[in-house]
Amino acid sequence: MTALSRIPAFDAAETAALLDYPALLATLTHTVAEYAAGEIVSPERLVVPLQGGGVMLSMPSSARDLASHKLVNVCPGNAARGLPTILGQVSAYDATTGEMRFVLDGPTVTGRRTAAITALGIQALHGAAPRDILLIGTGKQAANHAEALAAIFPDARLHVRGSRAGSAAAFCAAHRAQAPQLAPLDGDAIPDAIDVVVTLTTSRTPVYREAAREGRLVVGVGAFTADAAEIDADTVRHSRLVVDDPAGARHEAGDLIVAQVDWQRVASLADVLRGAFERSGPLLFKTVGCAAWDLAACRTARDALDARRGG
């Protein structure tokens, strides 16, 4: 048996079991502050082209206690081959010796830490627990968010709007076991009672065009390139803006880039968490993700594994 074969490697289901949403949110809270303080190294991701329009994404990160490296391949042609579009893993390392400790499923880490960052933003920006949350989108990101928001805000009603007739109802039926409060939105109009909207699509053009309004937090998740925007530019311009990672947002937050925002007026999630941002007016939280959030997932998994061994 080689040293590599003794390293624990967890599949998607096992990775999800190690990343309990409330625990992941708590770890992210500390990790966001450390990253903002310069205590975590998280460089811009490296993108390497593959054949057929695919890309290989390398996202390393390092802190005093742990280092991580996410290596993910995105291959659009895999759908026709009956293979997943996204494949990869996140490796965790001892930050002093460099020894590999364990390996997690990459897409599962990405999905769960993305949903947890959304939940942290809602918790930090909305103030009181939300009552009615609208998810726009019915794909994998929406599924992760439904589970996360149900776990962290169990009393909130979760409404879903899809891009096709019947897609929201089918989504709710498929995921109600994980999120009992799921219900399809009745019609296209967004009720005034909705106090949080989360956009979770692959659309390159706006799927949310409502005017910016006090009392409603809009969270943009789906758009991840400079020329894609899920949220209308006027909505963005008339909102007070917060991003999870200011460095990455300048290159990847298409909703803000298309709207040509003044980056001097864009706050960070770390600013909100340390009380340096006034939570008033129409609010918009844009997430782009970064390797430091993968590190937070590895910390959460490490703690869960330690608890299992101790038990």
Swiss-Prot record:
Keywords: NAD, NADP, Oxidoreductase. It comes from the Bacteria. GO terms for cellular component: cytoplasm. It catalyses: L-proline + NAD(+) = 1-pyrroline-2-carboxylate + NADH + H(+); L-proline + NADP(+) = 1-pyrroline-2-carboxylate + NADPH + H(+). This is Delta(1)-pyrroline-2-carboxylate reductase 2. It holds the Pfam family OCD_Mu_crystall. Belongs to the ornithine cyclodeaminase/mu-crystallin family. GO terms for molecular function: hormone binding; oxidoreductase activity. Catalyzes the reduction of Delta(1)-pyrroline-2-carboxylate (Pyr2C) to L-proline, using preferentially NADPH over NADH as the electron donor. May be involved in a degradation pathway that converts trans-3-hydroxy-L-proline (t3LHyp) to L-proline. Its EC number is 1.5.1.49. The keyword Secreted does not apply.
